[in-house]
C-alpha cells in the first residue's frame, strides 16, 4: 500500500493542517439546517479528507462503507449504464467533462432522490447527501441544469461539491452554496508529516533528502509523501511523465535557435499525445507547461503573453472542445512569441529594475571609496 493511502487521516484529530476549515465544517454539521457546500482548493490540499470528515459529522462512520450501484442513463440519443459509489447516506458522482454529464447528473440524482432509505433516520437527518467531485469539469449548460436540480430536490438532498478552481463555477450555482476555500499546507506542515511517516517506516532521511522533498513538492502533501515512498523503495521519484513535460518545454525553447520549426512542432505534438494518453486534463497540462516555461524564460513581457495565451486556451477548454486543439494553440502562440523576441534583450518589471539599480549604485559607491 502506498504511503499516502496508508497514512490518510482516520480521525479528525489526525488532520494536521487546515484545522480552522475542519472546525467550521464540524460546527456547520451540528446544525439542523445544513446548506449546500462547495469546497475549493488546489490538488493536495486535503479536500477529499475534509469531505470524508464532514460526512462523518453529518451521519456516522457508516458513510465509509461504500458499494457500487448501476444506474441507467437515457441521453438525447444514447443509453448508458454507469456504476456509482454510494453508501446508505450519500452518493459520489465524478463528472468526466463529456457531453453526457448533464444527463448523468439529472438521471442519477433523480433516481437517488426518489429512493428512500430507512437507515437514514438513525442519524436524525431528513436528507441524503450528493457529493460531486471536479465540478469545474462541467460545461455551463450542465452547471445550469445542476442548479435547477438542486432547487428541485432541496428538501430531500444536500449537495457537497469539490473543485480545484472556483472561478470556473458559474455565479448562480455558487450563490446557492456555502463556500470554503482550502489552501495548500505550509512547508512546516509537510515537514512534520514527512518526518512522522519516515519515523514510522524506519526510513533514514538526511538534510539533503528532506531539502529535496520540500523543494520539489510544490507544497503538495501528496507529492511529498510520494517522494518519500520512492526514497523508501530506492527508486527515482521522477517518472516518465515528468520527462515528457521537460522534453516539450525544451522543444518550445529550441525554436529560438532558428532550427526547423516544423520538425520541432512535430516532436512537441508527439510528446503531447504521449501525455494525453495518461488521462491528464488539458487544463492541467497547460498549467504545468506555463509553470515550467516561466521558470526558464527571464523576460517579464514574454511571460505575461504566455499567461494570456494560457488563459485563452483554458477558457476554450471549458466549452467542450478537443484538448489537443487548444493545447496546440497555446504552444504555437508561445513559440511565435519566442521567435519574434529572440533578438531582443529581456525586459524586467519595475521591481526588478529598482533592485538592479540599487545594486549598481551600491557597487559604484564601493568602487569610489576604493
Curated annotation (Swiss-Prot):
CDD domains in the record: AAA (cd00009)
Q: Which InterPro entries match?
A: DNA_pol3_clamp-load_cplx_C, DNA_Rep/Repair_Clamp_Loader, P-loop_NTPase
Keywords carried by this UniProt record = ATP-binding, DNA replication, Nucleotide-binding
Q: Where is the composition biased (Basic residues)?
A: 354-370
Mark out the compositionally biased spans (Basic and acidic residues): 342-353
* Entry-linked Pfam families: DNA_pol3_delta2 (PF13177)
Q: Which residues bind ATP?
A: 41-48
Gene Ontology molecular-function annotations: ATP binding; DNA binding; DNA clamp loader activity
Name any Gene Ontology BP term. DNA-templated DNA replication
Region annotation (Disordered) maps to 342-370
Function of the molecule: Part of the RFC clamp loader complex which loads the PCNA sliding clamp onto DNA.
Similarity comment text for this entry:
Belongs to the activator 1 small subunits family. RfcS subfamily.
**PANTHER family attached here?**
REPLICATION FACTOR C / DNA POLYMERASE III GAMMA-TAU SUBUNIT (PTHR11669), REPLICATION FACTOR C SUBUNIT 3 (PTHR11669:SF1)
> Could you tell me what this protein is called?
Putative replication factor C small subunit L478
